[in-house]
C-alpha cells in the first residue's frame, strides 16, 4: 500500500528518469537551428573540435547536447531520417549505461548512433554488438554513412576476416560485429605472443543490440577455443549399441522439467552385464560411466529436428530460441560425440579447452555497457543483479493500437493446428498478412503441411540464411502474405505493411556490377566502363524502386483497411519475453495489427510446467474433444507457469555465473600476468581496468612495461620459489628441524647452485643467502647477453604460463563435472568448487614460477646471437601451437544438468595453499600478497 501511494505521489523510477530526459531533449532541440545552418564540410571540423575539448579535460556529459544535435542533423542529411524526441531519450539512457526498451519499429538502430558518436569522441572506441553477421554488416554500412559524414571511421568484424583486417576494424572509431566474434577475438588475443598482434583495443563501451537475446538467452553458452585430444572414439560406439535396449521407467527415469535422466538399479545391472563391467561406479570405470550418462542423455533428452539436425553427415545444433542452425558449435563433455554415435555419423574427437569465457563475464569487462531491445522489462531483475544494468522503458513515438486477443486452448495438438489453419485461411481471404510463430523447425513444417492441404500459399522461414531471412521477413506485411517462422527468426528487420519497396527492387534487379580485378597485359585498370555500368544500374534501381513504392503504398492502404499484420503464436514459449517479441512484430509505429496464441494441452509448457492448476481449470470449465476454451483465468494460469519457468531458468543462469566467476577471476589474473610479460620491451602502452568488487566502478590505468620491470618480475619469481623451498625444508625460524641435505638438493635441482649453509642462523638469513647467489648468476647472464637473453626468457615465461594454464583448465573441467556429488556428503558443491579451484590456481601459479626459474638457471646460451636464435625458435614453436588450436567454437550448453553423472574429480589439495609473496592477495585488493595480508602475517 505504501509503495503504491509513493508511486502515485512521486511516480515510478522510470517516470522520474523520463521527466529528467525530457528536459535534456529540450536543450538538444534548441541547438537544431544552429546545426541546420552548418555546411556539409563543417561537420568534420565540429567533430575535431569536440575531440580536442575532450583531450583538454571536458567530459562527455558536457558535450552530450551538441553531439546529439549534430548527429541528428547528419542523419537527416545523409540517410533522410531525423531522430524523434523519444529516440533522443533512448540515446541518453544508453549513454548512461542502461538498457533502453524500445518497441519493435521504433528505430533502435538509428537511436544507437547518438551515444555511439558521443562516446567515440573519446578516441577509445565503441563496439556495437548484434546477433548475426548480416545485421552487423547492414548496420555498419547503413549507419557508417552518417559516421563518415561526421568524420568518424567505421569497421565491421566478420567471421571471414583475417587478423590484419580485424585489427583495422577494431582501430576504427566505431566497430560493429556479432557477439561471438568479439568474445572469440578476446580469447584469441590472449593466446598471442606479441602485443602488436592483438586485434582488440581496450574494452571501452559496448552497445548490445537485442541485449536480452545475447545476455540472457545465450548466457548459458560459454565461448570455448579448443584443441583436439588423442582419445579413441570406440567407447561411444560400444555404449551406443546397448542404450536403445533400455526400457523407460523400468531402466531409467526421465525428468523433462529439469532436463535430467538417471539410471535405476535395474538399468545399472542390465548395462553392467551388456558392457561386461563389474561395477559401473567403481573408480576405475568412471570414464565408462561418463560415456553411459552422455549416451543416455543423447537418446532421451535430445531430439532430431528439434535440438539438432543431421546435415552433410554432421550433427548441427539448432538454436532453441531462434531455430537457426549453428554449424561449428558442438556440445561439450562428450555429448556431441554421443549424439553422433546415435545418428550413425562420423564421430569427431573430443576437444580439450585452451581458452574459455562466458558472455556474462566477457561483457562485464567493458568499462561501460548498454543495451537495446523491444522486450527487457520482464528480465529487469536479472539485468540489475548480474550486469548492474537498469532497464528504462521508452515511450512509443505514436500510441500503439495493436489488439492482443485472449489465448485459445484445445485438448490436442492436431485440433490446435486445424484451428490455426482455419484462422489463417479466413485472414488470407480478407487480404490480411499473417506471421505464424513456432517454437521449432519441426513445428514450422507441421503448420506448413496443414496450410498446404488447404491450398494456402505461404513462406516457411527455417532460418538457414540471414540475408534471405531478412528479405522474406521484410515482405511479411504484403497483402495476403502468410509467413511461418521460428519465434525470433528475422529479428532486426522491420515488417512494413504493404511491403518494402527497396528490398523488392533489389530482388528484381540483382546485385550491382562487380568491379574489374585485373587489366589485360598488365595495363592499368580502366574503370570508365565499370563506372558507366554502375551509374546505369543505380538509375535503373531508382526507377524500379519508385514504381514499386507506388505499388506498396496502394497495398499499404489495403492492408491497413484489412486490420494490419496479424500474429499467430502456435505455442507459448518458456519465457514471456519471447512471446512479447513475437507479438511486437505487429503494430509498429502506430500501425494496426493483432495477435493471438493457439495452445493445446499437449504443448511442452502445458504438459511439463502447467501444473495441476491448469488441468483443474480445464476440468471445471468442462473441456470436451474438439472444444476450445478461452478464459482470462486460463491466460493468468499460463502466465503463472511461465513465471515459474523464468525463475527456474534465472536460477540456472545465476548458478552458472557463480561457478564461472571462480574461473573468471583466475582467467583475468593469468591474462593480466601474460600481458605484463608480453608488454616488456614492446613499447606498446598496457591499458588495464580494475573493478571495485563492491561498487563495480572501473578505474582505467595505462603504462609502458620496460625490460627493467620484467627483470623485477623474474627476481620476484625467484624470491617466491626460494620461500617455497625454505617453507618445505626449513619450516622453523631457527636451524632446529631444518633438513639441510634435502634443502641443498632442492637448491641444486631448481637453481643449479652448489651451496653451503654453514653460519646461517635463521630462516630470513637462509632465504637472503640463496637469493643473492641466484641473483648474481642471473645478473651476470643478463649483462653478458643483454636484450636477446631477456627476449628468450620472455618467450620461456609465456610458454610455461600457457602450458600450465591449459592443464589447469582441464583440471577445473574435471572438478566441475564431479563437484555436484559433494552434495551427497552434506557439503555445498559451490563452496567446495571455489575452495578447491582457488587451491589449484595458487598451486599452478607456484608451478609456473618454479618451472620458469628452473629453466632460467639451467640454460647457458653460448652467445648473444644464440640466445636470439633460441628466442626466435621458441616464438615460432608457440605460434605453430596456437595455429593448431581449433578455430573458436562455442559449446551449446554450459549449465550443469541436475542428473549429470560425474567424471573423476581432482583430489583435494592441502587445506590452505601457499600463496606466493608476489602473487595477488586472496582478499581481492589487487595488491601483492607481501604488501597486503602477507605483511601482517609476517609481523606475527
UniProtKB/Swiss-Prot annotation:
Cofactor comment text:
May bind 1 zinc ion per subunit.
Q: Which GO terms describe its cellular component?
A: cell envelope Sec protein transport complex; cytosol; plasma membrane
Arranged from A to Z, the UniProt key words for this protein are:
ATP-binding, Cell inner membrane, Cell membrane, Cytoplasm, Membrane, Metal-binding, Nucleotide-binding, Protein transport, Translocase, Translocation, Transport, Zinc
Where along this sequence does the record place binding of Zn(2+)? 921, 923, 932-933
- What enzyme class is recorded for this protein? translocase
Give the chief site where it resides: membrane
**What residue spans carry the Basic and acidic residues bias annotation?**
884-898
Its localization reads: Cell inner membrane; Cytoplasm
Q: Which residues form a coiled coil?
A: none
Q: Which CDD domains match?
A: DEXDc_SecA (cd17928), SF2_C_secA (cd18803)
Keyword match Cytoplasm: yes
Topology term for the membrane: Peripheral membrane protein
| Molecular function (Gene Ontology), one example | ATP binding
Residue segments, region Disordered: 879-940
Q: Where does ATP bind?
A: 87, 105-109, 494
What does the record give as EC number?
Answer: 7.4.2.8
Q: Which cofactor does it need?
A: Zn(2+)
GO biological-process terms attached to the record: intracellular protein transmembrane transport; protein import; protein targeting; protein transport by the Sec complex
Assembly and interaction partners: Monomer and homodimer. Part of the essential Sec protein translocation apparatus which comprises SecA, SecYEG and auxiliary proteins SecDF-YajC and YidC.
In Swiss-Prot or TrEMBL terms, this protein is called Protein translocase subunit SecA
Amino acid at each position: 500500500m505504501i509503495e503504491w501511494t509513493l508511486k502515485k505521489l512521486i511516480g515510478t523510477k522510470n517516470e522520474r528518469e523520463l521527466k529528467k530526459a525530457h528536459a535534456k531533449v529540450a536543450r538538444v532541440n534548441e541547438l537544431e537551428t544552429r546545426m541546420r545552418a552548418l555546411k556539409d564540410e563543417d561537420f568534420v571540423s565540429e567533430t575535431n573540435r569536440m575531440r580536442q575539448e575532450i583531450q583538454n579535460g571536458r567530459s562527455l556529459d558536457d558535450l552530450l547536447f551538441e553531439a546529439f544535435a549534430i548527429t541528428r542533423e547528419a542523419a537527416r542529411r545523409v540517410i533522410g531520417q531525423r531522430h524523434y524526441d523519444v529516440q533522443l531519450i533512448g540515446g541518453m539512457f544508453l549513454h548512461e549505461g542502461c538498457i533502453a526498451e524500445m518497441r519493435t519499429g521504433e528505430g533502435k538502430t538509428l537511436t544507437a548512433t547518438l551515444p555511439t558518436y558521443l562516446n567515440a569522441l573519446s578516441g577509445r572506441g565503441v563496439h556495437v554488438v548484434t546477433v548475426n553477421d548480416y545485421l552487423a554488416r547492414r548496420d555498419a554500412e547503413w549507419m557508417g554513412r552518417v559516421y563518415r559524414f561526421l568524420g568518424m571511421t567505421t569497421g565491421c568484424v566478420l567471421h571471414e576476416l583475417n587478423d590484419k583486417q580485424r585489427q583495422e576494424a577494431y582501430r576504427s572509431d566505431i566497430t560493429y560485429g556479432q557477439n561471438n566474434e568479439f568474445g572469440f577475438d578476446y580469447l584469441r588475443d590472449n593466446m598471442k605472443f606479441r602485443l602488436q598482434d592483438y586485434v582488440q583495443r581496450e574494452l571501452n563501451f559496448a552497445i548490445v543490440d537485442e541485449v536480452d537475446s545475447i545476455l540472457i538467452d545465450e548466457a548459458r553458452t560459454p565461448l570455448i577455443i579448443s584443441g583436439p585430444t588423442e582419445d579413441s572414439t570406440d567407447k561411444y560406439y560400444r555404449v551406443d549399441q546397448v542404450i536403445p535396449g533400455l526400457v523407460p521407467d523400468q531402466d531409467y527415469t526421465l525428468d523433462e522439467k529439469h532436463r535430467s535422466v538417471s539410471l535405476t538399479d535395474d538399468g545399472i545391472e542390465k548395462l553392467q552385464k551388456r558392457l561386461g563391467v563389474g561395477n559401473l561406479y567403481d573408480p576405475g570405470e568412471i570414464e565408462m560411466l561418463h560415456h553411459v550418462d552422455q549416451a543416455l542423455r543423447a537418446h532421451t533428452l535430445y531430439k532430431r529436428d528439434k535440438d539438432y539436425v543431421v546435415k552433410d553427415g554432421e550433427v548441427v545444433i539448432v538454436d532453441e530460441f531462434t531455430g537457426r542452425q549453428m554449424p561449428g558449435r558442438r556440445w561439450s563433455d562428450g555429448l556431441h560425440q554421443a549424439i553422433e554415435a546415435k545418428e550413425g555419423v562420423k564421430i569427431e574427437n573430443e576437444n580439450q579447452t585452451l581458452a574459455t569465457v562466458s558472455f556474462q563475464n566477457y561483457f562485464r569487462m567493458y568499462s561501460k555497457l548498454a543495451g537495446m531491445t523491444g522486450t527487457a522489462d520482464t528480465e529487469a531483475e536479472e539485468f540489475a543483479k548480474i550486469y548492474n544494468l537498469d532497464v528504462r522503458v521508452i515511450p512509443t513515438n505514436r500510441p500503439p493500437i495493436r489488439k492482443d486477443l485472449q489465448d485459445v486452448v484445445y485438448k490436442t495438438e492436431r485440433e490446435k493446428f486445424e484451428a490455426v489453419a482455419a484462422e489463417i485461411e479466413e485472414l488470407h481471404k480478407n487480404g490480411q498478412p499473417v506471421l505464424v510463430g513456432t517454437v521449432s523447425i519441426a513445428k514450422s513444417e507441421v503448420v506448413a503441411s496443414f496450410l498446404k492441404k488447404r491450398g494456402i500459399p505461404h513462406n516457411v522461414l527455417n532460418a538457414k540464411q540471414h540475408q534471405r531471412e531478412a528479405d522474406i521477413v521484410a515482405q511479411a506485411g504484403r497483402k495476403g502474405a502468410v509467413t511461418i517462422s521460428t519465434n525470433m527468426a528475422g529479428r532486426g528487420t522491420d515488417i512494413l505493411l504493404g511491403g518494402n519497396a527497396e528490398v523488392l527492387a533489389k530482388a528484381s534487379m540483382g546485385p550491382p556490377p562487380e568491379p574489374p580485378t585485373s587489366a589485360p597485359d598488365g595495363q592499368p585498370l580502366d574503370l570508365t566502363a565499370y563506372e558507366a555500368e554502375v551509374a546505369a544500374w543505380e538509375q535503373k534501381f531508382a526507377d524500379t524502386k519508385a514504381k514499386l513504392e507506388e505499388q506498396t503504398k496502394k497495398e499499404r492502404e489495403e492492408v491497413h483497411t484489412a486490420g494490419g499484420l496479424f500474429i499467430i503464436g502456435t505455442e507459448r514459449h518458456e519465457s514471456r519475453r519471447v512471446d512479447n517479441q513475437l507479438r511486437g512484430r505487429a503494430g509498429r509505429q502506430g500501425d494496426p495489427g493483432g495477435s493471438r496464441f493457439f495452445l493445446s494441452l499437449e504443448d511442452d509448457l502445458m504438459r511439463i510446467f502447467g501444473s495441476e492448476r491448469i488441468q483443474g481449470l480445464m476440468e471445471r470449465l468442462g473441456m470436451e474433444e474438439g472444444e476450445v476454451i478461452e478464459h482470462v483465468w486460463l491466460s493468468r494460469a499460463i502466465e503463472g507457469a511461465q513465471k515459474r519457468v523464468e525463475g527456474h531458468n534465472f536460477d540456472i543462469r545465476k548458478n552458472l555465473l557463480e561457478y564461472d566467476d571462480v574461473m573468471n577471476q583466475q582467467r583475468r589474473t593469468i591474462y593480466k600476468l601474460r600481458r605484463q610479460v608480453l608488454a616488456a620491451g614492446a613499447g606498446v602502452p598496457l591499458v588495464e581496468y580494475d573493478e571495485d568488487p563492491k561498487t563495480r566502478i572501473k578505474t582505467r590505468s595505462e603504462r609502458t612495461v620496460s625490460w627493467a620491470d620484467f627483470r623485477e618480475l623474474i627476481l620476484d619469481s625467484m624470491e617466491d620459489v626460494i620461500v617455497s623451498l625454505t617453507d618445505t625444508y626449513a619450516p622453523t625460524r631457527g636451524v632446529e628441524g631444518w633438513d639441510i641435505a634435502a634443502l641443498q638438493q632442492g637448491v641444486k635441482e631448481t637453481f643449479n647452485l652448489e651451496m653451503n649453509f654453514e653460519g646461517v642462523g635463521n630462516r630470513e638469513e637462509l632465504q637472503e643467502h640463496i637469493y643473492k647467489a641466484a641473483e648474481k648468476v642471473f645478473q651476470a647472464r643478463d649483462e653478458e647477453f643483454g636484450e636477446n637473453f631477456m627476449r628468450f626468457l620472455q618467450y620461456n615465461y609465456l610458454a610455461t604460463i600457457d602450458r600450465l594454464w591449459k592443464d589447469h583448465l582441464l583440471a577445473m573441467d574435471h572438478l566441475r563435472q564431479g563437484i555436484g556429488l559433494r552434495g551427497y556428503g552434506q557439503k555445498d558443491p559451490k563452496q567446495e568448487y571455489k575452495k578447491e579451484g582457488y587451491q589449484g590456481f595458487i598451486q599452478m601459479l607456484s608451478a609456473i614460477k618454479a618451472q620458469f626459474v628452473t629453466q632460467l638457471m639451467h640454460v647457458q646460451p653460448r652467445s648473444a646471437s644464440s640466445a636470439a636464435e633460441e628466442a626466435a625458435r621458441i616464438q615460432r614453436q608457440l605460434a605453430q601451437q596456437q595455429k593448431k588450436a581449433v578455430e573458436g567454437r562455442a559449446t551449446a550448453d554450459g549449465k550443469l544438468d541436475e542428473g549429470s553423472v560425474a567424471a573423476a574429480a581432482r583430489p583435494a589439495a592441502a587445506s590452505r595453499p601457499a600463496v606466493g609473496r608476489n602473487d595477488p592477495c586472496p582478499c581481492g585488493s589487487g595488491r601483492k600478497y607481501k604488501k597486503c595480508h602477507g605483511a601482517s602475517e609476517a609481523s606475527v
